[in-house]
Amino acid sequence: MNLSIFKRVFCGIAAIFLFIAGLPVLAAAGAKIKIDDTKFFQIGMGFRGSLTVEEDAATSGTDSSFNPATENFRLYTVSQAHKNIQVEFNTELNANDVEVLDSVAKLDLGVFDLWIGRQLPPSDRLNMDGPFYLNAAWGYPAGAQLQSFGNQGQFGGRDDGIAIHGDANGGKLEWAYGVFEGLEGGADQEDNVRHTASLTYAFDDAEPGFYAGSTYFGAKKITTLNFAMHHEEDGVGTATDQGDFTGYSVDALIERTLGNGAVVDLEGAYYDWDTDDKFDNTITQGDSFFVLASYLMPGKTSIAGIQGQFQPYTRYVGYNRDMKNDTAKTGYTDVVEAGVNYVIDGFNAKVTALWQQTDDVTKIDQYVLGMQFQL
């Protein structure tokens, strides 16, 4: 790292910690208005901001770029109209516009739940995590998802459809199946639907709910395996050269609390995307994997009066493209990443600093400083 990069990163770190020092203690949930014993309205928010310095990425071609960004700003709302009926409506800032993220009615039918509307289709753990509930790492593994399962649908990986969710064996076995809009137009001239499914088994503690997190910060003993698959006839290609899309993934998470109170997490996933050997602008045929290890240090420290725990981590991503993607790239890419989090309040408040090197046609080094807060 040259002196210019060091100064910029150092100033960014100092600014963020000074900002944190002036924050009030954050609550673990948003505001909730109780109407009666079964009806309520709840609202919350989520923010993720970052500063990225990339070597040789300035217009000059020899200087480092300096890019601050608001990566996510979300407003969450949940309305319970009946003890068995909830409506979730979430929005996110997208550039200068506010987009609908989720707009879904959830019916608890006892044996299973029925969800209708715009939602996240059943998928791999990373997609279910979303950006706020990843373990340790700041962003999704580059290329690991070979483009998100849901990116042919609506904003943020969501899609319009209907899904059912259920569990058995005390919540250790969870399953989900959905039918979604999928690709509209283009190769899909017959308005085919996309079928999505996931099957999860927890060998140790059960994980609650459909949405997942990739760590429990030591609150659970986790050994969980998940399988997901998506399929759409004529889901890729062009109007004159269609192909069927099939994608599947297998992911695993292991979490253990050591005798000294430290928490170790090991996470990994494998993805395979098949586009019927057709070129597609949104989905790239190929396979990929990632492995991640993190170590949440025992005990809390204090920085500027804010108590938290340090969590160093490392991640490796391998990404092999069989077909050209939308930037005409093929072949193997690997990404090495190392960083540290300052975990203040679980997923609700943390600061991340990381280095990432992407080895594609050329090697690209990035330094990222990020912070996320939820209410």
Question: What role is predicted for each listed range?
Answer:
Residues 22-26, 56, 128, 279:
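Amphipathic, positively biased hydrophobic alpha-helical segments used for protein targeting
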Residues 10, 69, 246-248:
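Intrinsic disorder/low-complexity signature
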Residues 36, 58-62, 106-108, 216-375:
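Outer-membrane beta-barrel pore domains
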Residues 30-58, 62-185, 189-207, 211-215, ...:
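Outer membrane beta-barrel
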Residues 3-48, 170-172, 375:
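N-terminal periplasmic/intermembrane-space "pro-region" immediately following the signal or transit peptide
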